[in-house]
Amino acid sequence: MLRRVFLSLALLAAAPLPALAQANAGQPAPAFTLTDLDGRKVALADLRGKFVVLEWTNPSCPFVQKHYGSGNMQSLQKRFTAEGVQWIVINSTAASHSEYLKPADQKAWLQKQGAAASVAALDADGSVGRTYGAKTTPHMYVIDPNGVLVYAGAIDDKRSANPADIKIANNYLLQAFGELRAGKPVSAPSTQAYGCTIKYGS
C-alpha cells in the first residue's frame, strides 16, 4: 500500500504543470488596463471598434534596436496610426532588472527615436505580458475591431539583429493588415516571435 502511495506521488511530481493561460489568435484578446508614460490609464476596452497593435519592447535589446535604428518600427507606426490603428508600445521589464527604464527615461528614448505609437506604457509587474504570452522583444499582436486577436508573433521572418535583413524580410504585420483590409482572414495568424527574452520579475 505504502509503495503504491509513493509511486502515485512520484508520478504526480513528474507530471507537467498546467501551462499559464495565454492569448491565442482567433480568441478574444484578454482585457487589460495599463498606465501610460504620462500617468494616464489605458484600457483595451476603450479601444473597441478599432484595430489595435501591441508591440512589446526593450530599448536595450539588439533586435529592438534593429527595427528602431533602421526606422522600420517608426515607419510602421506612422503608417498604421495614420489609418486609425491604435498602436501600443509595452515594456514588461521588471523594475528590479538592470534594463528597467523609468517612465521618463522610456519616454525620452521613444522621443529620440521619433516613435509614432499612439500610446506607450510600462508593465513592470509583467501581468499583461504574461497574460498575452509575450516572450521576446519585439513581440507583436494585432487585435481586430471586435476585440479578437487575429495575429500573434514575430514582426517578420528574418530572425536576426541585422538591419540589412529588413529589406528582404516578409513583414507579418503588413501581410496581416493587407489581408484584413481585403476582407480575408489572416493566413498566418501565429508565428514564432524572435528577439531578446522579456525580463520578467520572479
Regions inferred by a protein language model and the residue ranges of each:
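Thiol-/selenol-based redox modules, centered on thioredoxin-like
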Residues: V142-S202
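Short, internal strand/loop/helix patches
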Residues: K107-V150
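A short beta-strand-turn-helix
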Residues: F32-V52
